[in-house]
Amino acid sequence: MHRYRSHTCGDLRETDALQPTRLSGWCHRIRDHGGVLFIDLRDHYGITQCVVDPDSGAFPLAEKLRSEWVVRIDGLVRQRPAGTENIEMPTGLIEVYVTEIEVLGAAAELPLPVFGDQNYPEDMRLRYRFLDLRREKLHNNIMLRGRVIDSLRARMKGQGFFEFQTPILTASSPEGARDFLVPSRLHPGKFYALPQAPQQFKQLLMTAGFDRYFQIAPCFRDEDLRADRSLEFYQLDIEMSFVTQEDIFATVEPVLRGVFEEFGEGFAVTPEFPRIPYAETMLKYGTDKPDLRNPLVIVDVTEEFSREDVSFNAFKNVIKQGGVVRAIPAPGAGAQPRSFFDKLNDWARGEGAAGLGYVIFEGDAGALVGKGPIAKFLPADVQQAIAAKAGLKSGDAVFFACDRPDRAAKLAGAARLRIGSELKLSKTGVFELCWIVDFPMYEWNEDEKRIDFSHNPFSMPNCNLEQFLALETGVREEIVGIDRGERNRDLNESNELRKRILEITAFQYDVVCNGFELSSGAIRNHRPDIMRKAFALAGYDETVLEQKFGGMYRAFHYGAPPHGGIAPGVDRIVMLLAGEENLREIVAFPMNQRGEDLLLGAPSNVTAKQLRELSIKLNLPEK
C-alpha cells in the first residue's frame, strides 16, 4: 500500500465497503459521541468520516488529535448505520473504521477557523492566507480559476491561436497608469518596467508575420486599489492580423459566451452581444459600463425643460450654461412612501449633486397628472411629453438629474442603478454581455484647456482617413505648434477645428458584463503617417513616438499588417463566475487594499548593500 494513501478523501463509495483503505489529510472536525470519536478527514478532494471506537488500538492517539492536525489513517470501509447517512456528501453513505493513526503534522492553536462563513478582518485572513485557503468556498474559487484558464486556453487553440510569452522586464511607457520600476544593476541609473500589458510586443509579433497570438498575460499597474482592481492581474491577451472589428467580435464572443455557459451554473448568457455606441450608452445608462440586467433607460428631457412656459428656473439656468436634464424612470415608485424619495434625494446630495427632482404620475393613460415638488412648475402638456418619452404610466415616478453633460450622465447612471436596486427591478441569474463601440478618439481636458487622447492612442481612427490626414493641410499651425501650450491656445481660438477633432471616433471597443468592464480592445493604427497625425492632433510631435514607442514605431515602417486585438480580464471573469464582489476572493495570494502582502511582508526594506549595488540612494518623504 502507498506510504500515505490508497484513496483520497473524496473517493470512497458503497462499492468499497469491507475494503481496507489508507487516507491522509487534515482533521476537519472531531466529535465525541458517547465515547466514540468521529473524525471528519479532509483533503483537496473531499471529506470522509472516520470512526474510532474505544477498543481500537488507535483510540489513545485519536484522543490527542486537534483541529487541522495532518494525519494518516488506516481502516476498513463500511456502510454507515441506517439513519446516519449524509446524502449531501459524496462519501456520505460510508465511513472508515479506524485501526491505525499516524500524526504527520501537528497544528498550533488556529488564529482563525477554516470552515464556515468567514467574518474575520481581511488583514488577518491575508496574514494567514494558507489557512484561509483551506476554507471550502475560497478553495473552490481558486480551483474554478484554474479551470476557467484551462477552458480559455482550449477555446483559443481551437480557433487556431498560438500561445506566446512576452518579456516581463521591459521599457517604461506611458500607458495610462504608473509603471512598477525595476532598477538595473548592470546599467546604473536606468530602470526596467514591469509591463502594464504586452501591448507593443503583441503588435510587434503581428508585424513579424505571426497571425493569431494569445497569452494568459501577467500585467502590473501601480494604481489606486479597489474591489475590482489589483496591482497585478492576468488577462487573456489576444491579437490578430488582417482583421476588422467584426472579426474580433466574431472570435471573442464564442470564447466568452462558452466560458460563462460552462461555469455559470445555469445562468442565462446573452446569445448575441449587442453593439451599443458610446454616445448611446452614456445617454441611456449614464456609463460606458452598463449593467443591462437593470431595465431602466435614461432619456434626455432638456428640450422639455427649456420651453418658455416651464418655470423651474433651477434647471433652466443650468441649461442656459450648457447643461442638460436627464430623466430616470422609476416604474411603480408611486406606491413608495415619502421616505423613499427623501432618501434618494439625500443620496444624490451625498454624491455632490444639488439633489434629484422628481414627479409622480397619477391618472389615466393620455391624461396623466404629475405630483411632487417640481410638478407645479411643469405645464400639463410638458408632463405628458416627459411621461411619453420615459414610457411612464399611472403609479410610476421619474427622477431628474440636471448638470453639465458629463456630470448629469454620471449622476443619472448612478441613480438608475440605485433605483433599480431599491425597486428590485434587475434580472437575476443572468450574465448580460454587450459591446461598447465608437469611443471618441479625443477628449477636451477642461482643467488644462487641451485636447488629449480619450482612450488608446494606438487605435485606428474610425473615419475617412484621407480627410483625417487632410486636417493637417492649411491648419498645421493650429494642430502642431512649437509646444503643446501654443497648439492648445490655437485650438482654443479655433472652436470649429476643435469640434471637428473631438467628433472623431476610433475603432475602440469594450466588452461589458453585468456592469463590469471585462476588456478593452481596438483595431490598431498600423500606418506611421496616420500615427504621426493622430499624435499631432493631441499635441505630440514625432519625437514622442520615437522616444516612448520607438521599437513599435520603427517596425511599422517595414510593412505592418492591419491588425487588432483585445484582452479580457481573467480575474474579473472568475470573480463574476464565482459570484464574488472582490478580486481578493478569487486570487490565491492577493495584496490588501494598501498594496501589502501581509503573508510574506512585501513591500519590504532592503539592505544598504543591496542599494549600493543598484547605485540607489533613498529620498524618503517626511512623516
Swiss-Prot record:
InterPro entries: Aa-tRNA-synt_II, aa-tRNA-synth_II, aa-tRNA-synth_II/BPL/LPL, Asp-tRNA-ligase_1, Asp-tRNA-ligase_1_N, Asp/Asn-tRNA-synth_IIb, AspRS_core, GAD-like_sf. Residues 199-202 are annotated as: Aspartate. ATP binds at R221, D222, E223, E517, G569, V570, D571, R572. Its EC number is 6.1.1.23. The keyword Nucleotide-binding applies. One of its GO terms (cellular component) is cytoplasm. Coiled coil: none annotated. It comes from the Bacteria. It catalyses: tRNA(Asx) + L-aspartate + ATP = L-aspartyl-tRNA(Asx) + AMP + diphosphate. SUPFAM superfamilies: Class II aaRS and biotin synthetases (SSF55681), GAD domain-like (SSF55261), Nucleic acid-binding proteins (SSF50249). GO terms for biological process: aspartyl-tRNA aminoacylation. Homodimer. Belongs to the class-II aminoacyl-tRNA synthetase family. Type 1 subfamily. NCBIfam families: aspS_bact, PRK00476.1. This is Aspartate--tRNA(Asp/Asn) ligase. It comes from Methylocella silvestris (strain DSM 15510 / CIP 108128 / LMG 27833 / NCIMB 13906 / BL2).
